[in-house]
Amino acid sequence: MDISSRHFRAEFLQEWQGSPDAPYFDPSTPRNITGLVGHPVRLLCRVKNLQNRTVSWVRHRDIHLLTVGRYTYTSDQRFEAQHKPRSEEWALRIRSPQRRDSGQYECQISTTPPIGHAVFLNI
């Protein structure tokens, strides 16, 4: 690799990754979750460098905001936000999931614009 190729690659990676202290999702987090009807299931995302931003879970089927931070914003009592202080893990727990709960969910970081990590649930 010559110097100009390395320089281009370095510029591209810097632009693609954004600021070195910007929040990002741990790419090793599972994107496909399979659960059983009636058995609790947990959707997970790991966020690095969150700083003062918040994490939310959104159900794509109806663009329903389910959680913000550790607070649950849906009247459906089966959904629960889970997060341990000082942890990088943010989870959405669904008690007694049904087949209709299958589909895409998104863990979002409150950047401008928001960035998301899609998780697909199959019940």
Residue ranges and their predicted role:
Residues S4-S5, S19, S28, S56, ...:
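Generic serine detector
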Residues L13-V41:
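N-terminal edge beta-strand
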Residues P40-N49, T54-D62, R93-S96, D101-T112, ...:
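Structural signature of extracellular immunoglobulin-like
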Residues Q82, R86-A91:
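Aromatic sugar-binding surface patches on proteins
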